[in-house]
UniProtKB/Swiss-Prot annotation:
It comes from Rattus norvegicus (Rat). The modification Phosphothreonine is found at T1088, T1174. Induction: In both brain and pancreas, no circadian oscillation was detected. Keywords: Biological rhythms, Cell cycle, Cell division, Chromosome, Developmental protein, DNA damage, DNA repair, Mitosis, Nucleus, Phosphoprotein, Transcription, Transcription regulation. The keyword Ribosomal protein does not apply. Residues 1147-1159 have a biased composition (Basic and acidic residues). One of its GO terms (cellular component) is chromatin. The keyword tRNA-binding does not apply. Residues 657-676, 965-989 have a biased composition (Acidic residues). It comes from the Eukaryota. This is Protein timeless homolog. Residues 651-676, 942-997, 1092-1205 are annotated as: Disordered.
C-alpha cells in the first residue's frame, strides 16, 4: 500500500508527529495529541485492519515512534502514549483477525499485516531500543509498593507486552534464508535483549515473591525466547563435542556415503546416453497389461527395473480434509554467542527462578486468575527446563516444584481434556492437537526425570522416585492414557512429531513399568470395570397371566379365609418385608407399580401372609394418596383392597434380554437399547504381559507402521522404539501374524533393498524375522496370502495360527447357539410370511414363534442378513427412534395450517390431515408450543358439545364416556410426554384402578395440610385468589395469573405433592412442560367463582356448604355378570365404608343427588375441580356401572360461553 494512498486525516496526523533530521528527531508541538489520535484511529478500524496497514506501509514505527521512544524518554506523557501505540501496532495478526482467514481477500490482508510485523521486529533488533525499555523497567521496579502508582503498574505491563509482541512475530524463512550457526533476526533480537540487561530483569521478576503478578507475562516471554531451541543442544554448548554426538554424525555420514556409492554403481551399469535407433521393443512375459496381454516395453532393458504401471498417470489429489498435518515447529541452531547466552540464562533460571515461578503460575492457574489456555506455557516450561536439567547436570532439587503426583495428575487431566475437545470441537481440532502435543511433551519429561532419578546415587532421590512410580503405576488412568492416545491418533490433526513423541513416551513408560514389576514380586494395581447392563426400554405388556372372572373368583375363595386369619393375627410382622428394591436405579417413589405387581404375584402363588405383609409395608412406605389403603383401614376393607389388586390389570415390564458376546461390536446399531455403565473399583495383581496385550490391536499397529514409513527421517532412538514395540507384540506375545500385512511387507522390501540398510541393523533383523515366520505359516495355511490384504485382530490371528474354527470349537458358553437347518427353514418361512404385513414388527413376530431355542432380536436380525433374506441390519430399525428436524418450509406450512384451522372444532386433527411431512401428533404439538402458536396443550384438544339432556341419561354409559373421557386422539399426544409425566400418569391410573373414587376431597386435603403445618401457605393461596377476583372485577378482562411464592415457606408448599393436589382440585392450572414455571389461575374462572374457591379454603365455609353425594344405583340387571358387578361395586363399598367412618356421608345424599344433577342448565357443564387427566380415567371406570356418578368433591358450575374444556 503506497503512502500517497493513505487516508487524508491519517496522513495529516502522521505528519504532525515530527521529523527526523541528522539522527535527531524533532517533535511537533501537537505530537502527544497526534499519538493519541492514532490510538483512537486504531480503535475504530474495520475488519480489514486498514489503519494498521496504512501505518505499516508508512513505516511510522521505524521512522517516528522508535526515535521518539529513544530520544524523548524524559517526556513521560508522550513516552507512555508511544508505548501504548506500539503495543497496539505490534499485537499478533492472529489476535487481530481471530484466526487465519480462509477467504482469499481477508487472507491477503492477514499476510500483509504479518509482513509489517516482521519489519517491526527487525527494527527493534537494536540495543538502543531495548536499552531504553530496560532502563525504564528497572526504574519502575525500584519503586516500592507504597510508592508505585497505578500508572506505573500499567507501564510495567505495557513494556512486558511490547517485548512479548516483538518476540511473538514469526520469522520469514523464505526472506531470511538463514542456515544453522548464522545470526537470524530472532538471534539479533535475543542478543539485543542480553546487551540491554533485559534478561536480568526477567530473572528478577521470576524469582521475586513481590512481583508474582507478572509471572505469566514473564513465562510467556521466556517461552518465546527459546521457541526455536532444543534443550539438549543448549546443555551441550561450550563443552566440546561429546562422544555420542560424534558417533551420531558419523552414522549419518556413513548412510549418505553408502547411498551415494549405490547410486554410482547403478549409473555405471546403465548404457550410455546415446540413443540407439535399433533398440527395438520387448515383451515382458508374466506381466499383463490392460488387455490381458503381455506388456510391451519400448525402452532399453536397463530401465526395466524402474518400470511401473503408474508411469505417466496423474497423481491422485488428496482432499484437503484428508491431508496429513504439517509440521509447524521449526528448530534451528543459533549463532554460538546467542547459544552461550541462552545456556547461561537457563542455568541461572533453573537454580534461582524455576521453582518460585512455576509455583506462582500454578497458583494462578488453579485460582483461575490466568487467561484461557495459559496452562500451555506452564507445560512448555516444564518440558523444556526439565529436559535441560537432565542434559546439563541432573539436580532433582532444581525442578522439585513440578516433580510430584499432583503435577502428573494436572498434566494427565489436561491431556485428556485436549483430546476430548479435539473430538468435539472439529473446527479448532488443529489447535487442540497442538496443545495436546505440548501436554504430551511435558508428560514425557516427567517420566524421563523420574527414570533419571532411579540412576541417582542418592538414596533419598531413589526412594522419591519409587514412591512416584508406585503411585502412577497403581492408578488406572495413567496406564490407560497411552492406549487412549493411540486410539485417538489422527494424522489429519497430529503431525509426525507428535506420533514420534508418543512412541518414545510409550517405550519409556513400558520400560519403567517392566523394570518396576521385575524388582517387585507382585504389584497390586487399581482396576476399574465398567459393568454394562443392556436393558430394553420399558415395554409395557399385558398381565403375565390371563384368567377369567370365574377363575379369579375361585382363587379368591381359596385365599379369603387364609387372608382373614392372617389379618386378625397381631403377631404378623412387616419389619422384615421391604416393598421396594433399594439397589435398583429406579427411585423409591417410582416403585409403587412394582410393589403392586409383587402383591399380585403373591396372591396368585397362594402366599397369603406375604401378600398381606407386603400390602401393609407398602402402606407405610407410600402413604400419600392412600393407594395401599388409609392408615386406619379395617380388616374388611383390607380384604376388599387385596381382592381388587388380584383382579386388576397391572402394567408389567419385559425382562431384559442379555445379548451374546459374539456381536458386541455391533451394539451401536440397536438404537432402542440403553447401555448403563456402573464403574466398579477394585484391586488386582498386575501382570505385565496382560497389559501388553492391550497394545495388540490393529489401530496401534497401524500407527507404528505409519511412523516406520519415515525410517530414514527418524532418529536412531525412534527406530529402536518402533522395533522394540513390534518385537514385544510379535515375540513376547507370540502374535507374529498381527504384522502379516501387505503394506508392512512392502515397507520391509524397501528397507531390505535400501543401500544404507547396514545402518538399520535392528529393523533389518526384525523384518527378516517376521518374513520368516510368515513363509513358515504360508506353507501350512495357504489362506495367509489372502490375509495379507487386511489388518487383523487377536481372534483372526488365533484362527490363522491354530486353524479356522478354533474359536467356535472352544468351550465358550457365552457364544450364541448354532442355527440348525430346521430352524433356518422356520426362520425363512416366518420372515416371508410376515415381512409385508403393515403395522407389525416382523422381528418381534418371529421371536414370538421361535420357541425351541431362545434367541435375541439381534441374533435373528444378523442371521437374516447372513441368509441373504435382508440387505442390512438397518432394515429392521424400530420406527420412531430418529428425531427428524423441522425445515423452515415445514415450519411455515405448520404455521399456515394453524392459522387456517384455529377456529375449527378439531385444530390438531385438521393439521394432521393436511400437513405434507407426516409426523406424530406429539411432535406436531411440541412444535406448535415451540413456535409460540399455543401456550398449552389443552388449546389443541378436540372441542365436543356435551348436551346433558334427559335423553342422554337413558344411555348412561355413552353419555358418561362423552362427558369425562378424553378424545382417543388426545391420548396419542400423551405418548410424547417426558418419562416423568408418563410415570405419574401410570401411577394415577394404578391408583384409580385400585382405589376407585376414594380420592380425598378438598376439605380433607385442607385439614391434612393444616395438620402438616401449612396453614400460612393456605392463607396466602386464599388471599391470592381474592386479590385476583378483585382485579378481574376492576379491569373487566381476564388472563392467567401466575402464583409466585415470595417466601421460602410458600415455595416449599408449592413443591408439596399434597398441596399441588389441592391446587388441581381448586381448578388452578399446573405449569406447562418446558414453557412455564409457576402455577396459574386460569383466565376462564370469573371473579365470583374465584371468591367461591377462596371461601372453600375456610373451615367454617366448608362445613356450611358441604354437598351431598347420592349413593350409586346398582347396574341394570342382565347387563353385567355377578363377578363384574362385584368388581365394580367393591371400590365403591370400600369408599362408602371410609366415608361413613369419617362422618362424610349424609342420609339426604340419596334424595338430592339426582335432583341436583337435573337442575344443571343445558348451556352449562359440570367441571370437577380435580385435574382433567385423572378425572377422565376415573370417569371411565365409573362408566362401567351404567349409571352416571357424581363425585363428592367440591364442584363449580362454569358457563360454557365459547368452547368446552
Amino acid at each position: 500500500m503506497d503512502l500517497y494512498m493513505m487516508n487524508c486525516e491519517l496522513l495529516a496526523t502522521c505528519s504532525a508527529l515530527g521529523y527526523l533530521e541528522g539522527g535527531t528527531y524533532h517533535k511537533e508541538p501537537d505530537c502527544l495529541e497526534s499519538v493519541k489520535d492514532l490510538i483512537r484511529y486504531l480503535r475504530h478500524e474495520d475488519e480489514t485492519r486498514d489503519v494498521r496497514q496504512q501505518l505499516g506501509a508508512a513505516q511510522i514505527l521505524q521512522s517516528d515512534l522508535l526515535p521518539i521512544l529513544t530520544q524523548h524518554r524524559q517526556d513521560k506523557p508522550l513516552f507512555d502514549a508511544v508505548i501504548r501505540l506500539m503495543v497496539n501496532l505490534t499485537q499478533p495478526a492472529l489476535l487481530c483477525f481471530g484466526s487465519v482467514p480462509k477467504d482469499p481477500t481477508v487472507r491477503h490482508h492477514f499476510l500483509q499485516v504479518l509482513t509489517y510485523l516482521q519489519a517491526y521486529k527487525e527494527a527493534f533488533a537494536s540495543e538502543k531500543a531495548f536499552g531504553v525499555l530496560s532502563e525504564t523497567l528497572y526504574e519502575l521496579l525500584q519503586l516500592g509498593w507504597e510508592d508505585r502508582q497505578e500508572e506505573d503498574n500499567l507501564l510495567i505491563e505495557r513494556i512486558l507486552l511490547l517485548v512479548r509482541n516483538i518476540l511473538h512475530v514469526p520469522a520469514n524463512l523464505e526472506q531470511e534464508k538463514r542456515i544453522d550457526d548464522d545470526a537470524s533476526i530472532h538471534d539479533r533480537l535475543l542478543w539485543a535483549i542480553h546487551l540491554s540487561g533485559m534478561d536480568d530483569l526477567l530473572l528478577f521478576l521470576s524469582s521475586s515473591s513481590a512481583e508474582q503478578q507478572w509471572s505469566l507475562h514473564v513465562l510467556e516471554i521466556i517461552s518465546l525466547m527459546f521457541r526455536d531451541q532444543k534443550p539438549e543442544q543448549l546443555a551441550g554448548v561450550g563443552q566440546g563435542r561429546l562422544a555420542q554426538e560424534r558417533s551420531t554424525d558419523l552414522a549419518e555420514l556413513e548412510v549418505l556415503r553408502q547411498r551415494e556409492v549405490a547410486e554410482k554403481r547403478a549409473r555405471a551399469l546403465q548404457r550410455g546416453n546415446r540413443h540407439s535407433r535399433f533398440g527395438g521393443s520387448y515383451v515382458v512375459q508374466g506381466l499383463k497389461s490392460i488387455g490381458e496381454r503381455d506388456v510391451v516395453f519400448h525402452k532399453g532393458l536397463h530401465n526395466l527395473q524402474n518400470y511401473s504401471s503408474d508411469l505417466g498417470k496423474q497423481p491422485r489429489r488428496v482432499p484437503k480434509r484428508r491431508q496429513a498435518a504439517q509440521e509447524l515447529s521449526v528448530h534451528r541452531r543459533s549463532v554460538l554467542n546467542v547459544r552461550l547466552f541462552l545456556r547461561d540464562f537457563c542455568s541461572e533460571f533453573l537454580e534461582n527462578c524455576y521453582n518460585p515461578l512455576m509455583g506462582a503460575v500454578k497458583d494462578h492457574l488453579l485460582r483461575e486468575k490466568a487467561q484461557q489456555h495459559d496452562e500451555t506455557y506452564y507445560m512448555w516450561a516444564m518440558a523444556f527446563f526439565m529436559a535441560f536439567n537432565r542434559a546439563a547436570a541432573f539436580r532433582p532439587g532444581f525442578v522439585s516444584e513440578t516433580l510430584s503426583i499432583r503435577t502428573f495428575h494436572f498434566v494427565e487431566q489436561n491431556l485428556t481434556n485436549y483430546y476430548e475437545m479435539m473430538l468435539t470441537d472439529r473446527k479448532e481440532a488443529a489447535s487442540w492437537a497442538r496443545r495436546m502435543h505440548l501436554a504430551l511433551k511435558a508428560y514425557q519429561e516427567l517420566l524421563a526425570t523420574v527414570n533419571e532419578m532411579d540412576m541417582c546415587p542418592d538414596d533419598a532421590v531413589r526412594e522419591s522416585s519409587r514412591i512416584i512410580k508406585n503411585n502412577i503405576f497403581y492408578m488406572m488412568e495413567y496406564r490407560e492414557l497411552f492406549l487412549a492416545l493411540f486410539r485417538k491418533f489422527d494424522e489429519r490433526y497430529h503431525p509426525r512429531s507428535f506420533l514420534c513423541d508418543l512412541v518414545e513416551t510409550t517405550h519409556l513408560f513400558l520400560k519403567m513399568l517392566e523394570r518396576f514389576c521385575r524388582s517387585r514380586g507382585n504389584l497390586m494395581v487399581q482396576n476399574k470395570r465398567k459393568k454394562r447392563k443392556k436393558k430394553k426400554k420399558a415395554q409395557e405388556q399385558g398381565v403375565a397371566f390371563s384368567r377369567s372372572p370365574e377363575e379369579l373368583q375361585a382363587m379368591w375363595s381359596a385365599l379369603a379365609e387364609r387372608l382373614l386369619q392372617c389379618a386378625q393375627e397381631p403377631e404378623l410382622s412387616v419389619d422384615s418385608i421391604i416393598p421396594f428394591d433399594a439397589a435398583s436405579e429406579v427411585p423409591v417413589e417410582e416403585q409403587r407399580v412394582e410393589a403392586m405387581v409383587r402383591i399380585q404375584d403373591c396372591l396368585v402363588a397362594g402366599q397369603a401372609p406375604q401378600a398381606l405383609a407386603l400390602l401393609r409395608s407398602a402402606r407405610e412406605v407410600w402413604p400419600e394418596g392412600n393407594v395401599f389403603g388409609s392408615p386406619v383401614i379395617s380388616p374388611g376393607e383390607e380384604m376388599q383392597l387385596l381382592k381388587q389388586i388380584l383382579s386388576a390389570t397391572l402394567p408389567r415390564q419385559q425382562e431384559p434380554v442379555e445379548g451374546d458376546a459374539e456381536e458386541e461390536d455391533e451394539e451401536e446399531e440397536e438404537e432402542e437399547e440403553e447401555e448403563l455403565q456402573v464403574v466398579q473399583v477394585s484391586e488386582k495383581e498386575f501382570k505385565f504381559l496382560d497389559y501388553l496385550k492391550r497394545f495388540a490391536c490393529s489401530t496401534i499397529v497401524r500407527a507404528y507402521v505409519l511412523l516406520l514409513r519415515s525410517y530414514r527421517q527418524n532418529s536412531a532412538h525412534t527406530n529402536h522404539c518402533i522395533a522394540k514395540m513390534l518385537h514385544r507384540l510379535a515375540h513376547d506375545l507370540g502374535m507374529e501374524a498381527l504384522l502379516f500385512q501387505l503394506s508392512l511387507f512392502c515397507l520391509f522390501n524397501q528397507l531390505l533393498s535400501d543401500p544404507a540398510a547396514a545402518a538399520y541393523k535392528e529393523l533389518v533383523t526384525f523384518a527378516k524375522y517376521i518374513l520368516g515366520k510368515f513363509f513358515a505359516l504360508a506353507a501350512v495355511n495357504q489362506k495367509a496370502f489372502v490375509e495379507l490384504l487386511f489388518w487383523k485382530n487377536t481372534s483372526v490371528v488365533r484362527e490363522m495360527t491354530q486353524g479356522y474354527g478354533s474359536l467356535d470349537s472352544g468351550s465358550c458358553s457365552h457364544r450364541a447357539p448354532v442355527w440348525s437347518s430346521e430352524e433356518e427353514a422356520q426362520l425363512q418361512e416366518l420372515y416371508l410370511a410376515h415381512k409385508d404385513v403393515e403395522g407389525q414388527d416382523v422381528v418381534e413376530t418371529i421371536l414370538a414363534h421361535l420357541k425351541a431355542v431362545p434367541r435375541t432380536r439381534k441374533q435373528v436380525i444378523h442371521h437374516l442378513v447372513r441368509m441373504g433374506l435382508a440387505d442390512s441390519v438397518k432394515d429392521f430399525q424400530r420406527k420412531g427412534t430418529q428425531i427428524v428436524l423441522w425445515t423452515e418450509d415445514q415450519e411455515l406450512e405448520l404455521q399456515r395450517l394453524f392459522e387456517e384451522f384455529q377456529d375449527s372444532d378439531d385444530v390438531l386433527g385438521h393439521i394432521m390431515k393436511n400437513i405434507t411431512a407426516k409426523r406424530s401428533r406429539a411432535r406436531v404439538v411440541d412444535k406448535l408450543l415451540a413456535l409460540g402458536l399455543v401456550s398449552e396443550r389443552r388449546q389443541l384438544h378436540k372441542k365436543r358439545r356435551k348436551k346433558l339432556a334427559p335423553s342422554c341419561m337413558q344411555n348412561g354409559e355413552e353419555s358418561q364416556r362423552d362427558a369425562w373421557q378424553e378424545d382417543p386422539e388426545e391420548e396419542e399426544e400423551k405418548e410424547g410426554l417426558p418419562e416423568s409425566e408418563g410415570e405419574e400418569n401410570e401411577e394415577d391410573l394404578l391408583a384409580g384402578q385400585v382405589q376407585g373414587s376414594s380420592s380425598l376431597s378438598a376439605e380433607n386435603l385442607r385439614q391434612s395440610l393444616c395438620q402438616d403445618g401449612l396453614s400460612a401457605p393456605l392463607l396466602w393461596l386464599q388471599s391470592s385468589l381474592i386479590r385476583a377476583a378483585d382485579d378481574r372485577e376492576e379491569d373487566g378482562c381476564s388472563q392467567a395469573i401466575p402464583l409466585v411464592p415470595l417466601t421460602e415457606e410458600n415455595e416449599e408448599a408449592m413443591e408439596n405433592k399434597q398441596f399441588q393436589h389441592l391446587l388441581r382440585k381448586l381448578g388452578i392450572r399446573a405449569p406447562c412442560s418446558g414453557q412455564e414455571t409457576f402455577w396459574r389461575i386460569p383466565a376462564k374462572l370469573s371473579s365470583t367463582q374465584l371468591r367461591r374457591v377462596a371461601a372453600s379454603l375456610s373451615e367454617r365455609e366448608n362445613k356450611e356448604e358441604r354437598e351431598e353425594e347420592p349413593e350409586p344405583n346398582p347396574g341394570v340387571p342382565g347387563e353385567q355378570s355377578p363377578s363384574e358387578e362385584h368388581q365394580v361395586r367393591a371400590p365403591r363399598a370400600l369408599l362408602s365404608a371410609r366415608k361413613r367412618k369419617a362422618g362424610l356421608v349424609f342420609p339426604k345424599e340419596e334424595a338430592t343427588g339426582e335432583e341436583e344433577w337435573k337442575s344443571v342448565p343445558k348451556k352449562q357443564q359440570l367441571l370437577d375441580s380435580d385435574e382433567e387427566d385423572t378425572d377422565d380415567e376415573r370417569g371411565g371406570q365409573a362408566a362401567v356401572s351404567g349409571t352416571l356418578r357424581i363425585h363428592k368433591e367440591k364442584r363449580f358450575l362454569v358457563e360454557d360461553e365459547d368452547e368446552d374444556y
